[in-house]
């Protein structure tokens, strides 16, 4: 049971304490933002959908040996998680060229990458979440050299599991972002969420570059049918056994 006191409120979630100092309750919101919150709106049912998808994927990854913060889902839009100190770094994994990678490199949209690309972004809205080199991660003391290696290794492992899982759902995992945190013993755990908000997902049964989109790009690019796309992802995810 959480109190009314918030530990933290972000764009998509609110974090509350519980009776156990090592357990937090996360409330997933319907609020939607894009372009570092320059575009704002709401997606009906998004909190429930993203929480449910994340819970299923966290449990799947835990069974595959990926330690994460998920404990339980006491309500459709609520999750109990292990308390972690979030590392202020977004770890982005790219399998296919899209989004900023196309804008910054000139690669055509949809170009398969020969090897998954792992990138680190500073989780800092004031600075616009800039791309960081490993040297800058060390300079800012955001993580140790050993932790950086661990984050990349974990991201690649998670990518392998998610590619297979989404393939079984008839969905192509284009790219996605991850967040990690340190628990009370300084162990690194996968945290935050894995959902259409944080993944770029393409429907394999669609060839049209707009119709195939099943993620927050529908909101970013005003493609419409955002709620139905999220619902479809959830239905396909839940159809896969843990």
Swiss-Prot record:
InterPro entries: SAICAR_synt/ADE2_N, SAICAR_synt_PurC, SAICAR_synth, SAICAR_synthetase, SAICAR_synthetase_CS
UniProt-recorded Gene Ontology molecular function terms: ATP binding; phosphoribosylaminoimidazolesuccinocarboxamide synthase activity
Keywords: ATP-binding, Ligase, Nucleotide-binding, Purine biosynthesis
Keyword Nucleotide-binding in annotation: yes
Catalysed reactions, as listed in the record: 5-amino-1-(5-phospho-D-ribosyl)imidazole-4-carboxylate + L-aspartate + ATP = (2S)-2-[5-amino-1-(5-phospho-beta-D-ribosyl)imidazole-4-carboxamido]succinate + ADP + phosphate + 2 H(+)
Coiled-coil ranges per UniProt: none
Presence of the UniProt keyword Protease in the record: no
GO biological process terms, semicolon-separated: 'de novo' IMP biosynthetic process; cobalamin biosynthetic process
EC number from the UniProt entry: 6.3.2.6
Highest taxon of the lineage: Bacteria
Pathway listed: Purine metabolism; IMP biosynthesis via de novo pathway; 5-amino-1-(5-phospho-D-ribosyl)imidazole-4-carboxamide from 5-amino-1-(5-phospho-D-ribosyl)imidazole-4-carboxylate: step 1/2
HAMAP family the record matches: SAICAR_synth
Family according to the record: Belongs to the SAICAR synthetase family.
Name of the protein in question: Phosphoribosylaminoimidazole-succinocarboxamide synthase
């Amino acid at each position: 049971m959480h109190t009314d006191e918030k530990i933290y409120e972000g764009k998509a979630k609110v974090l509350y304490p519980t009776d156990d100092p090592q357990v937090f309750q996360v409330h997933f919101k319907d609020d939607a933002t894009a372009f570092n919150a320059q575009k704002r709106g709401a997606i009906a049912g998004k909190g429930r959908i993203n929480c449910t998808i994340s819970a299923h994927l966290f449990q799947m990854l835990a069974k595959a040996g990926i330690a994460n913060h998920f404990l339980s889902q006491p309500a459709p839009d609520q999750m109990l998680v292990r308390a972690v100190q979030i590392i202020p770094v977004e770890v982005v994994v790219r399998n296919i060229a899209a989004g900023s990678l196309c804008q910054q490199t000139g690669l055509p949209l949809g170009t398969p990458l020969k090897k998954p690309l792992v990138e680190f972004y500073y989780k800092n809205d004031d600075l616009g979440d800039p791309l960081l080199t490993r040297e800058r991660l060390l300079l800012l003391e955001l993580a140790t050299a050993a932790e950086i290696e661990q984050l990349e290794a974990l991201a690649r492992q998670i990518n392998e599991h998610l590619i297979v899982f989404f393939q079984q759902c008839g969905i192509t995992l284009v790219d996605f972002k991850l967040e990690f945190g340190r628990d009370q013993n300084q162990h690194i755990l996968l945290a935050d969420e894995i959902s259409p908000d944080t993944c770029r997902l393409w429907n394999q049964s669609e060839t049209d570059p707009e119709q195939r989109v099943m993620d927050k790009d529908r909101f970013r690019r005003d493609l419409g049918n955002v709620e139905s796309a999220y619902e479809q992802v959830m239905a396909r995810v839940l159809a896969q056994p843990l």
